[in-house]
Amino acid sequence: MEITFQDFEKLSLRIGKITSAEKIPGMKKILKVQVDVGERLATAIAGGAEFYEAASFIGKRVVVLTNMEPKTIAGVKSEVMLLAADFEGKPVWLTVDQDVPVGTKVR
């Protein structure tokens, strides 16, 4: 399915910094993370808890979709989406290798 450039422009992709990450009771594959996206702290659900320790997320600068409709997952309201590549069934978070300020727009 193709999208138009105008559709792409509707996406608010930003650099976010993960400030906290914790296991969700009863859940083995997802974590609750707090992400600083510049104008606010937002909650997200991140997959991969069976591959990564929660502490390994903290401090990472990741690419985040900030204007997605919130969705409640496992009783947690997820307000943004962290972007990841799916490599051999394992999420690999899209990160930046420089100290890019949180809230910076991704184009």
Regions found by a protein language model. Give the residues of each.
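Phosphate-backbone binding interfaces of nucleic-acid-interacting proteins
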Residues: 1-107
